[in-house]
């Protein structure tokens, strides 16, 4: 599940996080969809920016479905040499865009007019925030790794007012944990 908003959207990704956590997750009408969704990516295709706060309010984020609350996580690709384009993205075997398919998709969405706009041309680049998170998390090898090892189901029981309450939670590993697990796997 990928949702991309326009850059500088009203409220940034914080607005989308509130909408998901306060309206969609608690709504029983969305439950069957949420239950089958393992990975969700939200982006307004902007660089991470906390606007003077601690947590970023714009950028590209990921989470997994949850019954009550799903925290949005940042994803930063490993780039130990601080290169302009992280090595994983620079070396990824991207396919060429088929011009006819591109035109057909734009026609299907009645968006042919955007084809030659500067913003559209910029967004085709491999180093945009949305493309970076999609490449980093949805490349076949990494997506399978995340689905197999990166999602944990936790059943918690606690006493509330003398009664035992049980809650089921689903958590997804943070990007730092993923890189650590991949490094361990490579060493084994």
State the predicted function of each range:
Residues 1-188:
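ATP-dependent helicase/translocase motor core
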């Amino acid at each position: 599940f990928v949702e991309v908003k326009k850059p500088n959207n009203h409220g940034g990704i914080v607005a989308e996080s509130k909408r998901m956590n306060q309206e969609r997750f608690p709504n029983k009408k969305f439950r069957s969809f949420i239950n089958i969704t393992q990975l969700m990516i939200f982006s307004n295709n902007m660089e991470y920016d906390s606007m003077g706060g601690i947590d970023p309010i714009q950028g590209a984020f990921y989470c997994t479905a949850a019954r009550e609350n799903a925290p949005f996580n940042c994803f930063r690709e490993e780039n130990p040499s601080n290169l302009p384009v992280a090595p994983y993205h620079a070396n990824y075997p991207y396919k060429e865009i088929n011009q006819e398919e591109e035109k057909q998709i734009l026609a299907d969405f009645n968006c042919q007019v955007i084809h030659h706009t500067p913003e559209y041309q910029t967004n085709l680049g491999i180093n945009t925030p949305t493309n970076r998170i999609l490449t980093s998390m949805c490349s076949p090898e990494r997506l399978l790794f995340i689905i197999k090892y990166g999602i944990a189901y936790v059943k918690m029981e606690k006493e509330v007012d003398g009664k035992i309450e049980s809650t089921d939670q689903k958590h997804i590993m943070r990007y730092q944990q993923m890189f650590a697990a991949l490094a361990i796997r490579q060493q084994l």
